[in-house]
């Protein structure tokens, strides 16, 4: 398939920026892939190309097309959230901090919000009915709005300040107040308990929410956006990194997301792609008009519009064109196609919703082709759920062999949000991040009945005494009654070794040390120093060189020794001591032990501790926990940061303050809390450490099987769907088995779970069921035949949209529904509504009148 003249113009434009407006089916992804191929031909490297899009499906399509057309697999292709995640990871890596954080999905956010809110309500009332009632998605929307407003007011995403001011302004907005209401069984229900909590104690609630996530190394989607924005706007990212930037689905891009990407435009050729008529995410902050106007005015973008449709035939194209003209007054060019294989649109008037379901069922039963090529679509999940229930009732009246299998995307498609899968993931997360309080809370609530629900969050209140929920997964608390026992004992016996490595790069598994520095000290003072330069086999990366400044020539002239000699001497220096570093558990400890193993040496340490983790336990409200931040907090001067010996000296001083002023004075309180609660956690500690050992051996199947049997996740009478989910999870995770370090690979994979999701079209093919999906879920999908159900007044447009007087986005939703079919579109609507014994007339959607008569049967 060749490029059209418009596609060719966009693909070969490198002397100007381009705004590519591409209506549904006009080959936008095809154009993007060819522009990337052309960039590579012109000498731009894969690392200098950045492609961003809105959905995982679009991301995978772009990757596949780029690979197909130019054979290149290393071009940077991300979703917007995935790019923000990468910015945060790269920033912390450049600071010498390897973050183990995970990304929380809306289920995690909803569960955490509900738990925290119910706990706070209990503090002021003994009424057991005083609980929150909103669904998980609604909680996520409210949290997101508060964080968005806080950012608009100019507050840092790290700061606990600003929540009160944000909430005060939002409470004046009726749209925000409406988020506290939901519909159940057709009736509007307002969660006054949660509304009043946010109104009266909202800042306190948001700080608890923030602390719960940050202390567990969890970020929600809003954290990704606002932390990435903070990094970019502070100048802590390389804004000249890319020579070609392509931002896809611009109509779905939020203003803040655009502000982040915009910072990289100055030294790049930029192409923004999208279709302004498919803007259906205004509720989450998309602002295509503002973005397009800014891009045209400030980046001299030339507008190129694709017109040749490659998806559907002339009837469906004329229907879409006529609809846009009638709904928006948009004059679109005639479709460039001679394809007449499609059919005119069928509009089917039904009786009530039961009759509509029966008619749709019969249409599918009589469909001659593969039923995975047909789709049932509606405006809302609520409408689809009602249809699904009616289809289920019809199926029950038929022999098994005659039944039609259906699935709803809301329940079946979101694999990683299935309860049984999230239970597995909670256990797996605890093996790589014992401090994940959200996972601990889920395990306790659903699978560990011997521990009282809420205990994990209650234990975090003892952070000032050094109590962390991760302590109960540490065998030392069962042996000694205190996670800090070995550290305190070593301090009293003058055998604490603070150490630090400067390295060839930021990968603890692949890079090598170029400097090992340490001091041995205790309560009696400092007793010995250790400082060696090491001649590495690997080349020193540019990033590492810019951090510490030591090249191989410098190392050679400053007594650089072999890694074997350095490890031998350090093992003797630290023999029998407790080793402490800053962020060492995520970097230095890993590199040290890996290189010791490589040299056939043993590091005989009495324990490992990390001042970053200690600080996070005692101090929850810090902007970050970098060594420089803690030095500033405690008045420690580190004049030669990123020299290993200078960093060691600073770490020693900070650790001494932590021990003398926090860890030792709080020992009695900490030990009493641990001793009172540890027995309830002991079986879980043993199990998690066993699962961890299985993962370290690369036995992912064994770990999943062990988790399933130990906590009854899969039982003989478990549903077939749960068994299949467990197997599918293993298939998704088995790539970890053959990696050099399975725990680290698993940690990286789990961090991306919330960002990955599934591809709708692949799920449909796998399940071999007829999909029921919303218009929003259909974005990026296409089907031979589409049945658009519920096209009645107050369904589309929705009642809230009609009441607001602004139906613009509802009209666009209808347009998206019109453009998903390749060959046939059937629109159905119920003409009656039955309440009890009463029957009422129901009007069709007024948008049906916008479809040209000559496109309708």
Explain the meaning of each model-derived region.
Residues 1-98, 236, 318-321, 819:
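P-loop NTPase Walker
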Residues 2-12, 16-21, 76, 105-110, ...:
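Conserved helicase NTPase motor core
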Residues 79, 494-593, 597-605, 620, ...:
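Conserved non-catalytic scaffold segment of RNase H-like nuclease domains
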Residues 199-202, 433-497, 504-505, 517-522, ...:
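Accessory C-terminal helicase-associated subdomains
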């Amino acid at each position: 398939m060749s490029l059209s003249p418009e596609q060719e113009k966009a693909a070969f434009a490198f002397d100007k920026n381009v705004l590519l407006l591409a209506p549904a089916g006009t080959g936008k992804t095809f154009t993007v892939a060819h522009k990337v191929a052309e960039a590579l031909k012109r000498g731009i490297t894969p690392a200098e190309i950045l492609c961003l899009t809105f959905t995982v499906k679009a991301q995978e399509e772009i990757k596949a097309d780029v690979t197909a057309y130019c054979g290149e697999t290393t071009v940077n292709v991300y979703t917007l959230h995935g790019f923000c995640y990468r910015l945060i990871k790269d920033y912390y890596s450049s600071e010498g901090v390897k973050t183990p954080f995970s990304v929380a999905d809306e289920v995690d956010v909803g569960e955490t919000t509900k738990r925290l809110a119910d706990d706070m309500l209990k503090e002021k009332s003994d009424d057991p009915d005083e609980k929150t009632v909103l669904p998980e998605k609604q909680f996520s929307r409210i949290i997101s709005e508060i964080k968005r407003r806080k950012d608009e007011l100019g507050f840092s995403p790290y700061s606990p300040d600003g929540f009160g001011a944000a909430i005060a302004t939002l409470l004046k907005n009726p749209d925000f107040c409406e988020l506290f209401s939901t519909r159940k069984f057709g009736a509007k229900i307002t969660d006054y308990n949660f509304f009043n909590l946010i109104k009266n104690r909202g800042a306190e609630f948001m700080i608890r929410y923030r602390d719960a996530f940050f202390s567990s190394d969890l970020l929600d989607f809003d954290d990704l956006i606002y932390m990435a924005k903070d990094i970019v706007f502070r100048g802590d990212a390389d804004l000249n990194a890319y020579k070609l930037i392509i931002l896809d689905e611009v109509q779905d891009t939020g203003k803040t997301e655009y502000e982040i990407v915009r910072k990289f435009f100055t030294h790049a050729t930029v192409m923004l792609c999208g279709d302004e008529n498919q803007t259906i995410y205004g509720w989450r902050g998309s602002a295509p008009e503002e973005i397009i106007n800014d891009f045209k005015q400030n980046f001299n973008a030339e507008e190129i519009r694709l017109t040749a449709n490659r998806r559907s035939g002339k009837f469906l194209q004329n229907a879409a064109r006529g609809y846009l003209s009638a709904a928006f007054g948009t004059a679109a060019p005639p479709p460039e196609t001679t394809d007449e294989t499609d059919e005119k649109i069928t509009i089917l008037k039904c009786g009530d919703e039961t009759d509509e379901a029966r008619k749709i069922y019969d249409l599918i039963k009589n469909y001659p082709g593969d039923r995975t090529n047909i789709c049932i679509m509606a405006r809302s999940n609520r409408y689809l759920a009602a249809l699904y229930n009616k289809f289920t009732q019809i199926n029950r009246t038929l022999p098994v062999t005659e039944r039609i299998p259906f699935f709803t995307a809301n329940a079946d498609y979101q694999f990683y949000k299935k309860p049984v899968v999230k239970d597995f993931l909670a256990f797996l997360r605890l093996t790589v991040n014992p401090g994940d309080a959200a996972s601990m809370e889920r395990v306790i609530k659903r699978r560990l009945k011997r521990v009282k629900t809420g205990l994990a969050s209650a234990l975090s209140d003892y952070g000032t005494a050094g109590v962390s929920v991760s302590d109960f997964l540490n065998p030392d608390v069962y042996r000694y009654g205190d996670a800090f026992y070995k550290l305190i004992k070593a301090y009293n016996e003058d055998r604490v070794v603070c150490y630090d490595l400067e390295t060839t790069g930021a990968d603890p598994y692949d890079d090598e040390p170029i400097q090992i520095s340490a001091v041995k000290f205790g309560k009696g003072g400092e007793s010995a120093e250790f400082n060696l330069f090491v001649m590495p086999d690997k080349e020193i990366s540019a990033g590492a060189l810019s951090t510490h400044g030591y090249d191989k020539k410098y190392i050679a002239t400053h007594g650089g020794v072999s890694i074997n000699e350095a490890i031998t001497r350090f093992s003797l220096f630290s023999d029998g001591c407790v080793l402490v570093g800053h962020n060492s558990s995520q970097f230095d400890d890993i590199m040290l032990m890996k290189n010791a193993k490589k040299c056939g040496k043993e590091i005989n340490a009495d324990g490992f501790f990390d001042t970053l983790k200690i600080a996070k336990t005692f101090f929850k409200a810090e902007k970050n926990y970098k060594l420089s931040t803690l030095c500033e907090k405690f008045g420690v001067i580190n004049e030669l940061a990123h020299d290993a010996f200078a960093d060691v000296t600073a770490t020693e001083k900070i650790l001494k303050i932590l021990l003398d002023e926090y860890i030792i004075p709080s020992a009695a309180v900490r030990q009493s809390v641990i001793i009172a609660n540890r027995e309830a956690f002991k079986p879980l500690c043993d199990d998690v450490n066993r699962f961890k050992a299985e993962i370290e051996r690369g036995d992912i199947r064994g770990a999943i099987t062990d988790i399933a049997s130990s906590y009854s996740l899969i039982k003989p009478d478990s549903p077939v769907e749960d068994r299949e989910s467990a197997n599918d999870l293993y298939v998704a995770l088995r790539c970890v088995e053959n990696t050099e370090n399975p725990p680290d690979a698993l940690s990286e994979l789990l961090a991306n779970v919330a960002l990955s999701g599934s591809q709708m079209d692949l799920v449909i093919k796998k399940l071999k069921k007829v999909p029921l999906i919303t218009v929003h879920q259909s974005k990026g999908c296409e089907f031979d035949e589409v049945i658009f159900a519920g096209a009645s007044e107050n369904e589309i447009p929705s009642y809230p949209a009609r009441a607001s007087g602004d139906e613009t986005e509802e009209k666009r939703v209808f347009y998206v529904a019109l453009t998903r079919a390749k060959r046939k579109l059937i629109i159905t609507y119920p003409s009656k509504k039955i309440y009890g014994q009463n029957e009422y007339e129901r009007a069709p959607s007024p948008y049906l009148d916008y479809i040209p008569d000559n496109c309708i049967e």
